[in-house]
């Protein structure tokens, strides 16, 4: 039995992860935490999320005493916190010997030079960063098991990389073009005008400047063109990706490349049949569908995930179970 502390449990991802861990027979929840100045401290989780009324846990402030209690009682800590907050908390809990699963972007790049540009801060813990493993569960299981610092991937990168990594050896130098649409929960729980009911509409954002672009490119080993879109639905991501494959590549070659997922229970791959968001919402699954034109050499692959599940909470749970061999 492994004891897990969840910090940032009041947000969509933290609450979703709480529900997932609560349902796991081999995991227990050491505690749920929010910042000391949070308006949610002291509230039962069910006050914020009535659908979780079966989880009788209260949101505690992350005081120094609380941090000491976590170190004494927990085997691991999950950080569903802002990037700049995770930066420091992850390093501190790692130094105390706990396994850290960070859902922010604070440890996703191995190159410290990336952080000022994409996250607005200098990375102060290069020695911890050097130990961090990118937690793309289907691809990095051995490394996830071997380290105590796991950077859980972003939602768009999870959808995109799951689709693209099997094709890496078949790609030409032409940049893959990724157009991805995410539900409004991807923007977080905090009230914002552009995500309010009367304002939300299908629209691109972060064009040629979204921080997930270099994350995808780094893990793929090739530059990409990535355009995210805000969708007018609650949950889910659909990424439609166009790539050029090397001359002589056949449909059979593509099928062979995607056979890497034959033993991956959470990834479903279909040829000439494309996924929809409704099929993956509230599940930990990724559905892929692809079609290849041998004459032009162009392939289109679509990837559907739930942004709060496979794109965040359920992938964190995958990483926890891989790390602890559960």
UniProtKB/Swiss-Prot annotation:
Q: Which SMART domains match?
A: Semialdhyde_dh (SM00859)
* Cellular compartments per GO CC: cytoplasm
The active-site annotation reads 155
CDD domains the UniProt entry points to: AGPR_1_C, AGPR_1_N
SUPFAM superfamilies registered for this protein in UniProt: Glyceraldehyde-3-phosphate dehydrogenase-like, C-terminal domain, NAD(P)-binding Rossmann-fold domains
UniProt GO molecular function: N-acetyl-gamma-glutamyl-phosphate reductase activity; NAD binding; NADP+ binding
Location(s) in or outside the cell: Cytoplasm
Taxonomically, the superkingdom here is Bacteria
Answer whether the UniProt record assigns the keyword Oxidoreductase to this protein: yes
Q: Does the keyword Cytoplasm apply?
A: yes
Q: In which pathway does it act?
A: Amino-acid biosynthesis; L-arginine biosynthesis; N(2)-acetyl-L-ornithine from L-glutamate: step 3/4
Reactions listed under catalytic activity: N-acetyl-L-glutamate 5-semialdehyde + phosphate + NADP(+) = N-acetyl-L-glutamyl 5-phosphate + NADPH + H(+)
Record's keyword terms, sorted: Amino-acid biosynthesis, Arginine biosynthesis, Cytoplasm, NADP, Oxidoreductase
The EC number of this protein is: 1.2.1.38
Which Gene Ontology BP annotations are present? L-arginine biosynthetic process
User: Which InterPro entries does the record match to this protein?
Assistant: AGPR_AS (IPR023013), AGPR_type-1 (IPR000706), NAD(P)-bd_dom_sf (IPR036291), NAGSA_dehydrogenase (IPR050085), Semialdehyde_DH_NAD-bd (IPR000534)
> What class does this enzyme belong to in the EC scheme?
oxidoreductase
NCBIfam families referenced in this protein's UniProt entry, alphabetically: argC (TIGR01850)
Belongs to which family? Belongs to the NAGSA dehydrogenase family. Type 1 subfamily.
General function of this protein: Catalyzes the NADPH-dependent reduction of N-acetyl-5-glutamyl phosphate to yield N-acetyl-L-glutamate 5-semialdehyde.
- Name listed for the protein in its UniProt record: N-acetyl-gamma-glutamyl-phosphate reductase
- Gene encoding the protein: argC
